[in-house]
């Protein structure tokens, strides 16, 4: 059996910071995993280096579930984004190793393909509704069947999801957190008009999505969901802060707009009530934040019992390693819904060469063995770590608000 002989962490910043774990075995086979936690990368590096890697050496690389349980239960201070990102990186790397030894693309070890490809959604944004829709039309012309719409809000200087670049968005943009002002009322007056204009310009064949980014109260979210109903959005994402799962019950009482949440969740316990009571339609837990493929499969299986589909987070704070892992997962589960997809920069793709491809609105992980992605450490070394914080938001009276 292949024994783990070495493991190391590589940190690189080809436009944004990524944390990669590389595990080597006695067979000469290695695997890679993503441990990136946007804006808080170095704590995960420390956790891996000081606490996880020493415990891996000498272990059987095939015993993925046992190693997962060892790292989760053995820590005692379990869960949380740092711990679960570290476990996720180990898990991805071990699945990569197992599939390479088997000579198969990972999705074949996960039960084989349930579909021919993975429907993804792109991000269209702009300072105005008109600019957002112009960019959405570009995505539609590229073959996307689903597009997330985010637009500037009149009277607010900066808004979540609206970037300087039309197609690349990195919110962690400052050596210290940048601040923006927020007005819920201005936003609620503006958002329905975005979707009305979108249906007029783009038609009804496209799936349209929207991210509220945890900024509303339950009753405000119910109001927005109700206002959006005539335009049939695919989902309303992260309508309220995710900590209070009971909030979604109130939203459900006021709207039939589908609800999605979960990118900040770290385990099945974070979403158990939401899924069990069918308070959401899509669970957005992601492979790098929720403990890797092993644990994400358990979340998906539980969700499948309650008719909840997956819609995994897939912004550029996931490296191509995590994106590849997500695609193998997506391809293999019965209750897949949709996958977020933001293209990486050319520099990032050079650091992380990968086999997955986009065609006609869908991604496919490819048939290379393992995850089908690697890290070019020579290229990675050209881009040293650069401290970057996520922004913060304040209300117009100066008080803090959820970003």
Curated annotation (Swiss-Prot):
Co-factor binding comment: Binds 1 Mg(2+) ion per subunit.
Highest taxon, organism lineage: Bacteria
Reactions accelerated catalytically: D-mannonate = 2-dehydro-3-deoxy-D-gluconate + H2O
UniProt: substrate binding residues: 38, 123, 263, 284, 313, 317, 340
Active site: 160 (proton donor/acceptor), 213 (proton donor/acceptor)
Pathway in which this enzyme or protein is active: Carbohydrate metabolism; pentose and glucuronate interconversion
InterPro entries linked to this entry: D-mannonate_dehydratase-like (IPR034589), D-mannonate_dehydratase_GalD (IPR053379), DgoD-like (IPR034593), Enolase-like_C_sf (IPR036849), Enolase-like_N (IPR029017), Enolase_C-like (IPR029065), MAND (IPR034587), Mandel_Rmase/mucon_lact_enz_CS (IPR018110)
Site feature Important for activity and substrate specificity, where: 315
GO molecular function: magnesium ion binding; mannonate dehydratase activity
Amino-acid biosynthesis listed as a keyword: no
Binding, Mg(2+): 211, 237, 263
Enzyme class: lyase
Gene3D superfamilies in the record: Enolase-like C-terminal domain, Enolase-like, N-terminal domain
One Pfam family here: MR_MLE_N
UniProt-listed Enzyme Commission number(s): 4.2.1.8
Family in the record: Belongs to the mandelate racemase/muconate lactonizing enzyme family. GalD subfamily.
Name the UniProt record assigns to this protein: D-mannonate dehydratase Caul1835
Organism: Caulobacter sp. (strain K31)
């Amino acid at each position: 059996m292949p024994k783990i002989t070495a493991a190391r962490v590589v940190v690189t910043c080809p436009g944004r910071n990524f944390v990669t774990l590389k595990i080597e075995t006695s067979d000469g086979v290695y695997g890679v995993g993503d441990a990136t936690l946007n804006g808080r990368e170095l704590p995960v590096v420390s956790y891996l280096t000081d606490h996880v890697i020493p415990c891996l050496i000498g272990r059987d690389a095939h015993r993925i579930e046992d190693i997962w349980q060892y790292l989760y239960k053995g820590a005692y201070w379990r869960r949380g984004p740092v711990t679960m990102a570290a476990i996720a990186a180990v898990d991805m790397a071990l699945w990569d190793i197992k599939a390479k030894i088997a000579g198969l693309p990972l999705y074949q070890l996960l039960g084989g393909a349930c579909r021919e490809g993975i429907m993804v959604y792109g991000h269209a944004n702009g300072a105005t509704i008109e600019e957002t829709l112009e960019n959405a039309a570009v995505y539609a012309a590229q073959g996307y069947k689903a597009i997330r719409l985010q637009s500037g809000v009149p009277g607010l200087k900066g808004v979540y999801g609206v970037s300087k670049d039309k197609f690349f968005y990195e919110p962690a943009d400052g050596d210290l957190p940048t601040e923006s002002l927020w007005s819920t009322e201005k936003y609620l007056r503006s958002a329905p008009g975005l979707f009305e204009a979108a249906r007029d310009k783009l038609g009804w064949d496209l799936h349209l999505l929207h991210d509220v980014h945890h900024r509303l109260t339950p009753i405000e979210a119910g109001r927005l969901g109700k206002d959006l109903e005539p335009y049939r959005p695919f989902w309303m994402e992260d309508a309220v802060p995710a900590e209070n799962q009971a909030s979604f019950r109130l939203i459900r009482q006021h709207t039939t707009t589908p609800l999605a949440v979960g990118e900040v969740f770290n385990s099945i316990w974070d979403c158990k009530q939401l899924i069990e009571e069918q308070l959401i339609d899509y669970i957005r837990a992601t492979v790098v934040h929720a403990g890797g493929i092993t644990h994400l499969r358990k979340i998906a299986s539980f969700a499948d019992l309650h008719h909840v589909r997956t819609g995994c987070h897939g912004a550029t704070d996931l490296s191509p390693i995590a994106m590849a892992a997500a695609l193998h997962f997506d391809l293999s589960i019965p209750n897949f819904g949709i996958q977020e997809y933001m293209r990486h920069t050319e520099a990032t793709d050079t650091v992380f060469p990968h086999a997955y491809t986009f065609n006609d609105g869908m991604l496919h992980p490819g048939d290379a063995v393992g995850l089908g992605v690697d890290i070019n450490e020579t290229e990675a070394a050209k881009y040293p770590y650069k401290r970057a914080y996520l922004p913060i938001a304040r209300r117009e009276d100066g008080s803090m608000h959820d970003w």
